[in-house]
């Protein structure tokens, strides 16, 4: 048990988002989702992997004797003075070998959130002064939720902020946080309807992934709320295309869209990750909603990459890696 606790404490100290306990041949691989990439944390004997899964399932009130059917669980882990919420998901493969994914939900802190260009944050903050819809895109682990939470926290002392997520990724006492539970009939649409009756000032929608959720999000923005949300898109222009694909009429988007932000985490030369944004707002955004002609990254993205290289913030190789987003 001490070895398990040591591994988990190391994972928490590195602020790893997800731990994958995966069977591989005759042993287990512990994979860590860190800075948007899946990296090998360690390889362990099969017995260790099975015991780790059993230990965590027991702590999360999951059925330890069930190795094939999917299960969900939750627990709280204490790492020194810090309390971290864990969400667990297990399933067995056709050979009866069990795998487990653990999501670590941390308190929101600013010491690990670095901006490649702080002036971009100021530009984002100006969008908060208008009611409407601000959407974020970027790969898993690029910091979208952290960005939305930091923005909403700017308003939380004087306004009610409600989040709807699957699952909740950050523990934030200033917000009303709702979690999707499809088994209980509490999906995005149902919780959005509930939220509208609860009269928050600000909504955070974890993911807009179907036409019904997209239209309800638009309705929330039209009714005077500030709504922050995420969609799957490869770049800032793709956010608009994705909403159109989900059936949102462009005339609604013209009325509610306040900003679009695509973001990536880049590794700085000092070894710390930093966020770079590619943003659309104002007349540029409205023009894109009307014409939908944009493709790829904006000229500003390329400019910031070149500037970061010239200032020695990132290497030319790092810039080349993210040239296309």
Cite the ranges covered by each PLM segment.
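Short, flexible helix-loop junctions that flank or precede catalytic/ligand sites
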Residues: 1-325
